[in-house]
Regions:
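A polyanion-binding, active-site-adjacent surface
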Residues: 1-114, 118-160
Length: 161
């Protein structure tokens, strides 16, 4: 992703068939394909920084609280570096990324409830929640292409007014 940008997308963790193989978040799997399509459709391709809350491949595809905590210092550094350049907007993909980011920024979970499309202000940092663009969420209909496009576009409009 872009080094100096106003929108940072924070996902869950490397996917077994995606970032775990490619070394790049959201590259090489269905989640990455959907994110790429939506970024192109919203005009945000090349204008975002993309990372994951957890840097290692989770054993059962869902990171443990220990894995999230162990990786929080890396997430904090990435967010701080992002804040140096912009008035940041963070698009949080899924509940794990949401909770990890709230914790990394020193917030209280109960003050920032996760909900798809929710927008939170946290000391000048805008947080936008989305369901994760996982194959499971898209196949079950929890997240449709249009829902994802709408939330990504909204985050982009906040980052680039």
């Amino acid at each position: 992703g872009a080094d100096s940008c106003s929108l940072m997308i924070i996902g869950l963790a490397p996917g077994m068939h995606g970032a775990n193989r490619s070394g790049v978040p959201f590259v090489g799997d269905s989640s990455g394909n959907l994110l790429s399509e939506v970024l192109k459709a919203s005009g945000l391709a090349g204008r975002v920084k993309i990372t994951n809350a957890v840097k290692c491949l989770p054993i059962k595809n869902l990171p443990s609280s220990r894995e999230v905590k162990n990786c929080s210092r890396f997430l904090i550094r990435e967010i701080e570096a992002h804040q140096l350049n912009t008035s940041p907007v963070l698009l949080l993909l899924g509940g794990v990324a949401h909770r990890a980011t709230i914790s990394a920024l020193g917030g209280k979970q109960s003050d920032y409830r996760f909900a798809h499309g929710a927008v939170h202000d946290m000391d000048g940092v805008t947080l936008v929640d989305s369901y994760h663009c996982s194959r499971y969420n898209t196949q079950t209909g929890r997240l449709t292409y249009q829902m994802f496009l709408d939330v990504v576009t909204a985050a982009g409009n906040m980052a680039y007014p």
